Amino acid sequence: MKKINVITLGCSKNTVDSEHLMARLAAAGYEVLFDSDRTDAKVVVINTCGFIGDAKQESIDMILRAAAAKQAGKIERLFVVGCLSERYADELRAEIPEVDDYFGARTWDGIVRALGASEDPALATERRLTTPKHYAYLKISEGCNWKCGYCAIPLIRGAHVSVPMEELEEEARKLAGQGVRELMVIAQDTTYYGIDLYGRRMLAELLRRLCRIDGIEWIRLHYAYPAGFPDEVIEAMASEPKICKYLDIPFQHISDAQLASMHRRHTKAEACLLYTSDAADEED
């Protein structure tokens, strides 16, 4: 059985992408590893980050390390996927030709075909978990519609695309069946969830549905954009014991002038109103 090592760099969204890829590779007969300290597998896939300077450098360093291992005969095939290669594919091909091929953050079918893995849609909700067994990330959407002045995510990941609720419920059930007890709900902007599919923000409804899944005991919300934050989410947190009283919100700044220069879509007053919402006060 041929070993393949999937090295994941960057954020938790990348982790989910890698876990889906690993499930398809395992179904194709690969022995799948996920160890960033090893470059001795016959095939290596590096899932990169291209967001900030330090992350880009970390990705480049890992690619160069693996390329050197390939030149030394330790690796037979080397592939690079993810945000860095989505953003800089031409430059990377020119500078690091040892890589067999580069695939972006939106071309997962390409790497699946290159490695002979299954393209069966039924595997779309399968995961080879790399997190501690009691929790897993649940990515509810891809991309972002906001155009913040400092952020390249819309360029890299494209427009916001929500995953249908039924698919997320099925994925959560499978995760619960694998022993997962806590869901970390993630996206580029979790609070925007549903607008493209249902015509309105549906995060609160999704959270309530996830609460009904047997085996899931805690649900923790991450990447909640403050602009347009739905009051229904606070109400769901107050009434549903499985939803952790926790919010990961990137306020970024509290100066209206600075927020405007960053092209953020909320003000100081709106941020303060969210922080002091009636539902939150009632829960306290």
Language-model features, listed with the residues they occupy:
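Proteins enriched for Cys/Gly/acidic motifs involved in redox and nucleic-acid/cofactor modification
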Residues: 1-193, 232, 243, 247, ...
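Charged helix-capping and loop-helix junction motifs
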Residues: 60-63, 199-205, 267
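Conserved radical SAM core fold
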Residues: 189-193, 217, 226-229, 242-268
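Distinct, well-ordered alpha-helical segments
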Residues: 197-199, 230-240
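Conserved small/polar residues in nucleotide/adenosyl-binding loops
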Residues: 275-280
